[in-house]
């Protein structure tokens, strides 16, 4: 199942649960109390039959729970009526998210300029200083990894959280000269976070690349303008994340940590294929699946200051 279907299924389950809750409340209240009042008291229904009990004075006796259920029904119906607008807006929001699954995809930015400008998806991690290098200069791969973790699990983390975890569980050791995380350390870190992922080289045919991307949930790709500068300019090597492959338009949803203007845009998958950095040992990492029981990290929450979604 690809990531687009996962997001749609989550939204569908949410809506079904909301509708089921409303119907159950209404049906329970309707079944519990008949709503008839003959002037002398409430009549209860039992197995579809009216039930009433008369006292020695011939008056209909009101069972204790009849009043409780009647009051419960009145209160619940009032709650439903009072929240009708909220429920309607929630339904509209769910429908909007189903029509635009990219709203559930995380796309963090790495640079300090974006953070200074108050851009959405930017954060204070950009100014973290590591062994003579700022995160904003090398954090593209870690942003992509955080995108995957936040999008495909029920948890969240910041790119800096991902940096710290990669340092802990892999051989990742950034330096002044080389700060970017390598393919092997990326794969190890994601595997320990519960992801089934593979490292891949550029296939001979574009059609094969299309099939691989379509079958994956998300991907991290390494692009370079030296291979093709149709989309990326003056880029020696840069990690970006792609997801939600649309076969009808042959486009993917782009998470570009270094480009606040191009981030969260739909681009031709062909641009990605042509720009794959061929001098690298690998060109892209495919995320095939996520297994909660394999997640050794279970990190949840972003404590860094950031611009939000």
Role assignments for model-derived ranges:
Residues 1-37, 45:
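Gram-positive cell-envelope targeting signals
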Residues 35-177, 298-300, 306-309:
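Active-site-adjacent structural segments surrounding the nucleophilic cysteine of cysteine proteases
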Residues 62, 229, 261-264:
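A short local loop/turn or secondary-structure capping micro-motif enriched for an aromatic residue
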Residues 106, 113, 245-309:
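Noncatalytic regulatory segments and standalone regulatory/sensor domains
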Residues 136, 141-148, 158, 162, ...:
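Stable alpha-helical elements in mature extracytoplasmic
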Residues 143, 147-155, 165-169, 189-196, ...:
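Structured segments of extracytoplasmic/periplasmic soluble domains
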Residues 168-201:
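Mid-length scaffold segments of soluble, non-membrane domains
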Residues 201-259, 296:
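Active-site-adjacent substructure of cysteine-protease-like catalytic cores
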């Amino acid at each position: 199942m690809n990531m687009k279907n996962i997001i749609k299924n989550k939204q569908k389950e949410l809506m079904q649960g909301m509708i089921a809750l409303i119907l159950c409340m209404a049906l329970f209240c309707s079944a519990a109390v008949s709503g008839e009042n003959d002037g002398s008291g409430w009549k209860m229904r039992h197995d579809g039959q009216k039930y009433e009990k008369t006292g020695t004075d011939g008056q209909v006796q009101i069972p204790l729970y009849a009043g409780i259920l009647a009051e419960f029904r009145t209160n619940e119906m009032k709650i439903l009526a009072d929240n009708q607008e909220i429920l309607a807006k929630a339904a509209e929001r769910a429908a909007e998210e189903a029509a635009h699954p990219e709203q559930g995809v995380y796309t963090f930015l790495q640079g300090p300029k974006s953070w200074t400008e108050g851009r959405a998806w930017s954060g204070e991690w950009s100014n973290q200083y590591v062994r003579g290098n700022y995160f904003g200069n090398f954090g593209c791969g870690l942003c992509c990894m955080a995108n995957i973790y936040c999008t495909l699990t029920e948890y969240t983390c910041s790119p800096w959280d991902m940096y710290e975890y990669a340092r802990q569980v892999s051989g990742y050791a950034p330096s002044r000269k080389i700060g970017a995380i390598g393919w092997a350390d990326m794969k190890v870190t994601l595997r320990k976070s519960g992801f089934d992922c593979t490292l891949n080289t550029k296939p001979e045919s574009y059609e094969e690349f299309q099939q691989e991307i379509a079958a994956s949930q998300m991907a991290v790709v390494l692009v370079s303008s030296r291979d093709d500068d149709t989309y990326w300019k003056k880029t020696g090597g840069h990690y970006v994340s792609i997801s939600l492959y649309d076969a009808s338009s042959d486009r993917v949803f782009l998470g570009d940590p270094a480009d606040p203007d191009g981030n969260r845009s739909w681009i031709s998958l062909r641009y990605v294929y042509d720009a794959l950095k061929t001098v690298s040992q690998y060109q892209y990492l495919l995320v095939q699946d996520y297994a909660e029981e394999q997640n050794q990290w279970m990190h949840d929450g972003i404590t860094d200051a950031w611009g939000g979604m």
